[in-house]
Amino acid sequence: MFQDNPLLAQLKQQLHSQTPRAEGVVKATEKGFGFLEVDAQKSYFIPPPQMKKVMHGDRIIAVIHSEKERESAEPEELVEPFLTRFVGKVQGKNDRLAIVPDHPLLKDAIPCRAARGLNHEFKEGDWAVAEMRRHPLKGDRSFYAELTQYITFGDDHFVPWWVTLARHNLEKEAPDGVATEMLDEGLVREDLTALDFVTIDSASTEDMDDALFAKALPDGKLQLIVAIADPTAWIAEGSKLDKAAKIRAFTNYLPGFNIPMLPRELSDDLCSLRANEVRPVLACRMTFSTDGTIEDNIEFFAATIESKAKLVYDQVSDWLENTGDWQPESEAIAEQVRLLAQICQRRGEWRHNHALVFKDRLDYRFILGEKGEVLDIVAEPRRIANRIVEEAMIAANICAARVLRDKLGFGIYNVHMGFDPANADALAALLKTHGLHVDAEEVLTLDGFCKLRRELDAQPTGFLDSRIRRFQSFAEISTEPGPHFGLGLEAYATWTSPIRKYGDMINHRLLKAVIKGETATRPQDEITVQMAERRRLNRMAERDVGDWLYARFLKDKAGTDTRFAAEIVDISRGGMRVRLVDNGAIAFIPAPFLHAVRDELVCSQENGTVQIKGETAYKVTDVIDVTIAEVRMETRSIIARPVA
């Protein structure tokens, strides 16, 4: 008798519309219950039985119940699932398989089966890629996943690499394909094979894409020719190899090995500027005045060179610093190194006075054994030879940026606009509290930004610099010329790494059009989106593999008294993140390790400080001594404790 009763339907509708609801993201805990986080201030409790319907990270709409002044959330509708495609470890065997996602807050095994056509007999411990097929909030009885790809077996020493690449859906191998002959591009190539070009790289580098030749001019000026490998002499635009490079966008450098953007035959041989091998190049000839200014007579041209020596960073640095036993193989090579060091000095001073120079930071290198085990992690300071190459490349990229801007009006540019205008007033207010007075309008200009950066660099510590980082905008890849505030330059377009960056290949083709006096087509904006996304994924992959290797390396230090110097890099409500100075590992110090009485402890991300009983005990950029309390291999996280 109640069926199809319009009054009852109306009442139901009324009750539904009057019931309070909230949309937010599910945050799981290790205790079975969870929270629906609506925003930074508001969250609702989700009881354990209701948590069975959702997963950590799901965006949902929930009904809010109030009982005895306590509010709780009942999940009702799925807005966006947290898991779609994921990697994990397989449990069980044969017909009863489950997969545990590789995520710190997802501990439950999800029932699954292998996709049709996947020819692998899955067993306990295997790593796999899976896709979610069922979700309780979609009307399904339970969660269910389908295994779509076998990654590797559980005991594979190279799990960190294969799992990480699969997680980010990145290629595992070099692209297929061969380039048999050079294209006829209608370019006249200048024969520079007689000149003493040199390359300076790491000892292990195979994909050398830049060679340098310097010359002193009679009036005290210095001339530099930067010769860059020429893959677009082999790869036609729109060809199969070009399309593959466009998708990859970059060579992916991971600890221990790289996955190249181009076939290895090209990247490590045909295009690589190997010593005593004749190679086609795209070159730029530039002149520096006595104060390091790049003069206006910039010239881009096609050429043929033969590198006369493959030099190694550390050996060149040692020789210039009068240490070590390495000697250049001839006086001609020695003269090149001396002239390049002079250019480096001039350009460094020019950039210091007229642009911005990044502070030197350590690079960390993993030394790996045959089975991917970490034998050591070495800190490599940036030395004079690294700076020689860096100054030459920056100068060459400034030249390309100017030529492309003036001749074409477009290219692939690296653009960084400094501070977000919406943050200018907050930035000025923060700096004022630290005794630095800036004009909120001026700081948004290139000159104003450079002026502030120089003042910050003159500060005794990097604390204030760390505070204002959150107000900065991100660097972008753009087809429009624009300033690069981070470098303090009016325009910056890279073309010096075409073996490893697709954007540099595009700029090569545009520069060749300029050389030939032809018109060129503006690159499509979609390519900049693809490049930015690939750069993001490659960086995440490098970080993920690094985290795994750091956890392996420090595992046997857990619970010991071994001390490490550590710089505080971030402070949050839950504790502090620190970077171990000797090896670059990131570790977390939970708040209870800082002070036992929670009410007397204030960890402020806003201020970058930890206060105990009202006194500042720690701040970002402080260097403290820590020991390793625990290494959690399943989450690749390192927990540290301050030395009392």
From Swiss-Prot:
Localization per Swiss-Prot or TrEMBL: Cytoplasm
RNB domain mapped to chain residues: 189-516
Coiled coil (UniProt feature): none
GO molecular-function term, one example from the UniProt record: exoribonuclease II activity
S1 motif domain: residues covered: 561-643
Top enzyme class: hydrolase
Pfam families: OB_RNB (PF08206), RNB (PF00773), S1 (PF00575)
Protein name according to UniProt: Exoribonuclease 2
Phylogenetic lineage: Bacteria, Pseudomonadati, Pseudomonadota, Gammaproteobacteria, Enterobacterales
